[in-house]
């Protein structure tokens, strides 16, 4: 845990085997974790990690998204290689701490986001390459899907105001999906295979983490042009973004540090 106001490391949270993702809900003051080492998601109040509770899900969870109006957490699961079991996404009711649905998807998932205007979750599927939509209110199957013409949809975020998704693919391309027309467009090349992406709605910037060669591609989303590249470290494929203070955190595995970047 990092104190983002004072840029200070505080401590680590134990008991989260293979933790792959972390999501903080400002609306509910809760923290959610995807624990890939044991097929669970963790739930605890912000600042009260001793209150950690776990809910078993239908696979090895990776990406997380949350609908605060329904206390609905979606965990996008992955499976182990050569596992014949279908890949699923799991819906968890976080107030009752129960699994409410397990929905089969076409293949291995990556990241996921929640669309508060449509009350839908969008989930990247790596193979076959597509984005699937799942209704938050009635998650009984796939509500819509968008084919992505590139290998490995990975990073995903949403521009709610302009009704579009940003999708960064392992093949090295950045795509947008117009949610009104369903049009998919390749808008730019990337500096390498991406991982996590975040959209800054205040500055209209998109941050794309590139683990090799180790940088963050920054795009102006009004023009969809690359505005700058920021050097991080080889292997730094995970970033976090605090929209309240406009800081990006890049986690540097080789040097065991977190680099902090501020846009003004």
Task: Say what each PLM segment does.
Residues 1-264:
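Predominantly soluble domains enriched in secretory-pathway, periplasmic, or organellar proteins
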């Amino acid at each position: 845990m990092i104190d983002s106001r004072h840029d200070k490391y505080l401590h680590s949270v134990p008991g989260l085997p293979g933790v792959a993702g972390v999501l903080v809900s400002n609306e509910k003051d809760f923290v959610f974790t995807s624990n890939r080492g044991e097929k669970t998601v963790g739930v605890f109040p912000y600042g009260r990690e001793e209150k950690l509770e776990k809910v078993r899900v239908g696979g090895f969870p990776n990406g997380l998204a949350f609908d605060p109006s329904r206390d609905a957490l979606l965990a996008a699961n992955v499976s182990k290689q050569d596992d014949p079991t279908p890949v699923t996404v799991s819906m968890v009711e976080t107030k009752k701490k129960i699994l409410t649905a397990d929905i089969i998807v076409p293949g291995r998932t990556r990241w996921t986001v929640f669309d508060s205007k449509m009350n839908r979750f969008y989930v990247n599927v790596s193979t076959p390459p597509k984005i699937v939509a799942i209704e938050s209110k009635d998650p009984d199957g796939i509500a819509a899907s968008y084919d992505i013409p590139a290998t490995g949809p990975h990073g995903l975020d949403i521009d709610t105001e302009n009704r579009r998704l940003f999708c960064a693919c392992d093949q090295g391309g950045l795509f947008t999906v117009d949610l009104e027309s369903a049009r998919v467009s390749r808008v730019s090349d990337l500096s390498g295979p991406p991982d996590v992406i975040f959209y800054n709605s205040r500055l209209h910037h998109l941050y794309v983490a590139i683990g090799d060669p180790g940088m963050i591609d920054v795009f102006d989303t009004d023009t969809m042009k690359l505005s700058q590249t920021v050097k991080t470290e080889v292997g730094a494929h995970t970033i976090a973004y605090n929209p309240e203070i406009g800081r990006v955190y890049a986690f540097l595995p080789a040097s065991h540090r977190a680099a902090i970047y501020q846009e003004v």
